Every structure is written in structure tokens, then in C-alpha cells.
């Protein structure tokens, strides 16, 4: 299961926590990139936030990973499930064909 994770800052974090949070974020990314759970990760230019592609076996695994996200308390997080485009297009074609008028 693949998910697009988007995070944006919703509240400033205390300055005294800044360095620790950045270092924790570096560790979190390294841990999950090296395990293959995070495929891609990036920051947004000019914004306090970023995103990535996370691959997990279950929603519970995704929840566990995101519970460790260091900036979680200071972020709005959006998670979107990703589906294969070709499979989605095939499903759409079948739906359209099923709704089309049939000659009797």
C-alpha cells in the first residue's frame, strides 16, 4: 500500500526545541528510507512543510510510522492512498461500459 503524505506547519515550535526536532527528523527519515518504507521525501520550497511516498503493509503500520513523525504536533498532515493509474483507468472504462445503453 502506497500513500502520499503531505505535511505543512500549523504552529511554530518553541525555539529551544528547534535543533532537537530537526535532528529527530533526520533520524526518522534515515530510519524509514533505509528500511524502504519511505520511497521519496522532499520539502516544499518557500514553505515549512514537505511530503513523501510511504509504502506499508497495513494502515496500522502507517499509523505507527506517522506517530513517530517529529513535527507531527506542529503540522497539519494529509495522507492520500495511491492507486495504480492503469488499473484505475480500466475500472473507469468498465464502469462507463456498464452504464452505456445496451441494444436488446
Which sequence ranges carry the predicted segments?
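Conserved, structured core segments of small domains
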Residues: 1-104
Amino acid at each position: 500500500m502506497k500513500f502520499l503524505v503531505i505535511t505543512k506547519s500549523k504552529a511554530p515550535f518553541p525555539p529551544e526545541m528547534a535543533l532537537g526536532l530537526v535532528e529527530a527528523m533526520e533520524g526518522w527519515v534515515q530510519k524509514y528510507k533505509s528500511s524502504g518504507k519511505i520511497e521519496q521525501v522532499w520539502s516544499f520550497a518557500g514553505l515549512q512543510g514537505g511530503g513523501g511516498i510511504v509504502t506499508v503493509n497495513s494502515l496500522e503500520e502507517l499509523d505507527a510510522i506517522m506517530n513517530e513523525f517529529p513535527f507531527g504536533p506542529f503540522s497539519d498532515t494529509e495522507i492520500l492512498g495511491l492507486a495504480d493509474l492503469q488499473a484505475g483507468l480500466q475500472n473507469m472504462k468498465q464502469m462507463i461500459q456498464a452504464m452505456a445503453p445496451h441494444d436488446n
